[in-house]
Amino acid sequence: MGFYQGPDNRKITGGLKGKHRDKRKYEIGNPSTLTTLSAEDIRIKDRTLGGNFKVRLKYTTTANVLDPATNTAKKVKILEVLETPANKELARRGIIIRGAKIRTEAGLAVVTSRPGQDGVINAVLLKNESQGS
């Protein structure tokens, strides 16, 4: 079932507006993809406008982590989600979003990609905290 993202039929005062047209297909949205840690990677392939596809990462175990000191990237295992600046409740539930601080086998890192939109987790190691847990 889709999520309607068009204008609602309420005025500021709370009264109903007159309906002047039907809902359009382009006003349909999708629920958030709450990427969490799991034993395996699961991706969802959604069709979007124009016949394009969006790959959503539902469950994951690894992240592509860039080490800025050596300018090398490697695929490492994610151990836990430490904090999320957008919402502390997301960190408590273990949901990975852009800007979340995660602990990996390579050390602490900040997620730079949008897992629900890109289908992959890219992260950058934090300076002075590259030691593992």
UniProtKB/Swiss-Prot annotation:
Record-level GO cellular component terms:
ribonucleoprotein complex; ribosome
| InterPro entries per record | Ribosomal_eS8, Ribosomal_eS8_CS, Ribosomal_protein_eS8_arc, Ribosomal_Se8/biogenesis_NSA2
Tell me where on the tree of life, at the top rank, the source sits.
Archaea
Residue ranges, annotated region (Disordered): 1-22
* UniProt key word Ribonucleoprotein: yes
Keyword line:
Ribonucleoprotein, Ribosomal protein
Q: Which GO terms describe its biological process?
A: translation
How does this polypeptide assemble, per the annotation? Part of the 30S ribosomal subunit.
What's the name of the protein? Small ribosomal subunit protein eS8
Q: What species is this protein from? A: Saccharolobus islandicus (strain L.S.2.15 / Lassen #1)
Q: What is the lineage of its organism?
A: Archaea, Thermoproteota, Thermoprotei, Sulfolobales, Sulfolobaceae
Source gene? Answer: rps8e
